[in-house]
């Protein structure tokens, strides 16, 4: 699963997701992509589940790029613990997604296969997505 090797701070504040994503909003590496059209938080496990689903569909053909990385820690206190006594320990890692962000990209497969694979991967993710193609000028 994806997780950062080192971080500057072990714990972070929650914050909130506002606005659209300008960076990473177009298909840069592959021919087809899966683009977020709603905001949310995607865990490393959800990214891995989507990756496995895509790879099962394309088998040995094609190349996959994961354009998001879970670099933000989510903390959790142990079960049946009283309130207070500080913030809990980091439990898992998330990526914050804003509308417009390209999550996955594919190349080396036909459009029908890519559309099917990315559609199945979208079921594994907690954000609404759409299928996009690379803009060739």
Curated annotation (Swiss-Prot):
GO cellular component: cytosolic large ribosomal subunit
PROSITE patterns per record: RIBOSOMAL_L16_1 (PS00586), RIBOSOMAL_L16_2 (PS00701)
Top-level taxon: Bacteria
SUPFAM superfamilies hit by this protein: Ribosomal protein L16p/L10e
Descriptive protein name: Large ribosomal subunit protein uL16
Family, as annotated: Belongs to the universal ribosomal protein uL16 family.
Alphabetized HAMAP family for the sequence: Ribosomal_uL16
Transmembrane regions listed in the UniProt entry: none
Function: Binds 23S rRNA and is also seen to make contacts with the A and possibly P site tRNAs.
Recorded GO MF terms: rRNA binding; structural constituent of ribosome; tRNA binding
Quaternary structure (record): Part of the 50S ribosomal subunit.
InterPro entries recorded: Ribosomal_uL16, Ribosomal_uL16_bact-type, Ribosomal_uL16_CS, Ribosomal_uL16_dom, Ribosomal_uL16_sf
Listed GO biological process terms: translation
Sorted UniProt keywords: Ribonucleoprotein, Ribosomal protein, RNA-binding, rRNA-binding, tRNA-binding
Annotated NCBIfam families: rplP_bact (TIGR01164)
Pfam family, one: Ribosomal_L16
